[in-house]
Amino acid sequence: MRIAKSVAELIGRTPMLEFTHFEQTHCLNAHLLAKVESFNPGGSVKDRIALGMVEAAEKAGKLLPGGTIIEPTSGNTGIGLAMVAAARGYTAIIVMPDSMSVERRQLMLAYGAKLVLTHGKLGMKGAVDKANELAAETPNAIVVGQFVNPANPATHRATTGPEIWADTDGQVDVLVAGIGTGGTLTGIGSYLREKNPNVRIVAVEPFSSPLLSKGVAGPHGLMGIGANFVPDVLSRDLIDEIITVKEDDAYRTGRELAAHEGVLAGITSGAAVWAASQVAARPEFAGKNIVVILPDTGERYLSTKMFAINE
């Protein structure tokens, strides 16, 4: 019998899909291989680190039975933590900028989490500061700290990276991933680079907030990447190239994936695929396998400009 005893056991082992229609439409000679992380039970790649960070805190004796998990997040990590907390009997307090989509708020509340909103203009730093303030005044509480927690990239190194390597039979030429905490790129990238030192690693950040590429931060509409500060868990030395993506390009690409590939993916997925397509269009990558991370589902962005479609 193959029956899980906890929703946590359903996290990971997500599928990979080649975007054949997208390749043909855009006359790409490379293979775009998407790691579709919306297949996680909470709908995003962040389910992985939610479980990984909670388990690390439990093993370290920092998270005790009946304890409270507090986390600043742009949304998906909060949803994943709310899900894991519900399954393990913890209280979750999620701190999020009020500029994030209403669907994200509703999902966290549906899992039983308490939601604290901070001013969107303060970005993720405002949420981080508020989370630390709440932790100081809440008994038996911890901030798991995705931006600084080594369990974040370690989880991807232990799970996502090996899955990609196995599913491609080790034939990975390029990895393309957005930078939010940097944990996804760092964990997967370090694993792949160890297996093949020639793997090219491409980071994706907002055109309106090119902090990594130009040292300039600003407001933007690509929810989930571009935290406007450089996270501690990001290993910048792994990055070979940084591609900035405009909001309209991310939105348009996301809509195209839904309409022509049947994959309803989120804003940062659109951004990552657009960036991957720029790499794939280069003659030197003809015939190469370009792995692109699709962090979440588009269902949590239906109220945003991305899917503001006139009937």
Annotate each PLM feature:
Residues 1-311:
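PLP-dependent amino-acid enzyme catalytic core
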